Amino acid sequence: AYIDTHTAKTERQSVLVSLDRDGRVLRVDVTVFFEPAQYMAPQDFLRQYDGAVLHEELVIRRGIRPIAGASFTGRAVNNAVRRVLALDQVLQSTALSDVQ
């Protein structure tokens, strides 16, 4: 699991991105959110990432439905999930090359 802290619109938020052994998203949870509550990503938005892997369709308005009225939050969460998936790929490939 990874925690990504970033700015949503003007304030910080942290998301916990849990991955399985194969690098697929198990779940995404918001752990800290300092923006107004109405801009927080709802659970049905976050559940879209369940089972996701890093690919070109993992973006808002392609493979991910946007959040009405909270586009900054949606983009920030999407960017965080993509960062975590990319970081995990790098760390996993580094770990595999260290074993060989």
Where are the predicted features?
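Flexible, solvent-exposed loop/hinge segments and secondary-structure transition points
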Residues: 1-75, 79-100
